[in-house]
Structures are given as structure tokens and as C-alpha cells.
């Protein structure tokens, strides 16, 4: 029997010095707990294939051509080749400048640095040659896959959607997905999108 779980060495590791996530070589976020690393998982497919994931990759391709961290950073860069073109995906957990200089933090036990976690997973896509059909599936599963998520559009168009827990929504974080493309939302189904990336 073929093991549905990739080797742990195949996962990319991202961190914003407050949180972490693991991304499989197939372009899927398979471990992320929010808002803290000791919170229940939102994406947990590394442990259970039905426990939530967030995949962003070319349609019909599951093995990238190359993968690396940009030098001196925790920005993961994945290069994909298809029969119609080349695509580069860059991913990072974002840090921003320290935002509150007037009051002490209620979440930090140590004196804060100049930078702080923004709690944003940023995934950028750039088509460098030809045209590539891209697929995105975002299927969170709150509380280690014990609570389903429901999606709804939260912006004026189709580029922003929010996922909330179906039961006891206040006890779980809300996830906001923003894209420059159009996302398909169907309440209890995952957010999906297939777009053709234009030429460079």
C-alpha cells in the first residue's frame, strides 16, 4: 500500500517568530495552528488527510521542479513546470513593524523587538513563462478536525471570503482569504479557484 503521507523531510517550514506552519512539496499547507502554536489546528492534514489543508499549485501537477528558501530568510520559493509554462510560488508568514509603542503587550512575556507577527500567511504566484492553469483549494478544519468550517463572501466581489466554525464560532478564529482572482465559495465546501496565469 502507498502511504498517503509524505516524508517529514519533504515539508517546508515557515515561521513569523510567533507561529509556524508546514507546507508539503505538493504546495499544500498541512499544519497550521492559529493564533498561537499551541492552539488547536486549522490545517492538520499532516496527521489526518481530512483535517484541513490549503493547496496552491498548477492544475494536475503534484511535484515541483525546484524548491528553496530565499537566502537569509524563511521565504519558501517553489518553482513549477507544466507543459504550457513556468510558475514561481513564494510563501511566508509575515512580520511587520511593532505597532503599539504606548502600552505593554498582553501577549508577549518578553520585551518586544522592532518587529512583530502579523498573523498573515502570504502566498504569491508569478508566471515567468507561458500560461499556467493554477488551482487553489482552502479547506480549514477547526479544532483538530472536530469542527467544520463554513465559507461566505466577505468583500464586495469574489476575491475575499471568510471561514468561520459552524458550531461555537466565537471559540475559534475566523480565517480571511484574499485573492486577486475569483474564488468559488459554496458554504460548507472548501474555497476553490482555477485561473490561468497570464504571460509574464
Each language-model region and where it sits:
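Beta-sandwich/jelly-roll carbohydrate-recognition scaffolds of carbohydrate-active enzymes
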Residues: 2-200
Amino acid at each position: 500500500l502507498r502511504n498517503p503521507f509524505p516524508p517529514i523531510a519533504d515539508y517546508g517550514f515557515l515561521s513569523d517568530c510567533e507561529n509556524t506552519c508546514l507546507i508539503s512539496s505538493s504546495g499544500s499547507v498541512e499544519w497550521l495552528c492559529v493564533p498561537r502554536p499551541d492552539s488547536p489546528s486549522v490545517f492538520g492534514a499532516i496527521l489526518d488527510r481530512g483535517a484541513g489543508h490549503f493547496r496552491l499549485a498548477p492544475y494536475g501537477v503534484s511535484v515541483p521542479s525546484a524548491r528553496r528558501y530565499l537566502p537569509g530568510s524563511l521565504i519558501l520559493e517553489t518553482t513549477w513546470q507544466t507543459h504550457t509554462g513556468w510558475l514561481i510560488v513564494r510563501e511566508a508568514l509575515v512580520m511587520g513593524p511593532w505597532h503599539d509603542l504606548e502600552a505593554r503587550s498582553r501577549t508577549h512575556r518578553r520585551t518586544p523587538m522592532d518587529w512583530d507577527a502579523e498573523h498573515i500567511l502570504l502566498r504569491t504566484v508569478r508566471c515567468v513563462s507561458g500560461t499556467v492553469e493554477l488551482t487553489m483549494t482552502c479547506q480549514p478544519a477547526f479544532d483538530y478536525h472536530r469542527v467544520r468550517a463554513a465559507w461566505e463572501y466577505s468583500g464586495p466581489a469574489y476575491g475575499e471570503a471568510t471561514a468561520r466554525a459552524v458550531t461555537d464560532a466565537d471559540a475559534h478564529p475566523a480565517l480571511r482569504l484574499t485573492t486577486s482572482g475569483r474564488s468559488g465559495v459554496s458554504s460548507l465546501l472548501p474555497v476553490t479557484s482555477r485561473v490561468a496565469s497570464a504571460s509574464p
